[in-house]
Swiss-Prot record:
Its EC number is 5.6.1.7. The keyword Iron-sulfur does not apply. One of its GO terms (biological process) is protein refolding. It is an enzyme of class 5 (isomerase). Coiled coil: none annotated. This is Chaperonin GroEL. Together with its co-chaperonin GroES, plays an essential role in assisting protein folding. The GroEL-GroES system forms a nano-cage that allows encapsulation of the non-native substrate proteins and provides a physical environment optimized to promote and accelerate protein folding.
Amino acid sequence: PYEKIGAELVKEVAKKTDDVAGDGTTTATVLAQALVREGLRNVAAGANPLGLKRGIEKAVEKVTETLLKSAKEVETKEQIAATAGISAGDQSIGDLIAEAMDKVGNEGVITVEESNTFGL
């Protein structure tokens, strides 16, 4: 039963990451697994679980603050293409995303669907 709880926790982390960011599920899963492993190791060694929780929350706050300070706005079509190309691992896809975003504007919606036809 404990294994199932852990698996459900990691599954929820991946789902929430995908819902919020649309990317990063592998990183989130690896981080969640490390947090659980190290948390259990520390509790087994006598650490206070509530103290660990508070420490994790403080660390998350600091990391979030640091990331937000270093974040840069992505505004131009070229920046969007570069960012999307890196995320997709394919610059041509990045260019397509930038073109689509340019056409629909900031308030527009882009729907991406999987196709069974290759190259069409």
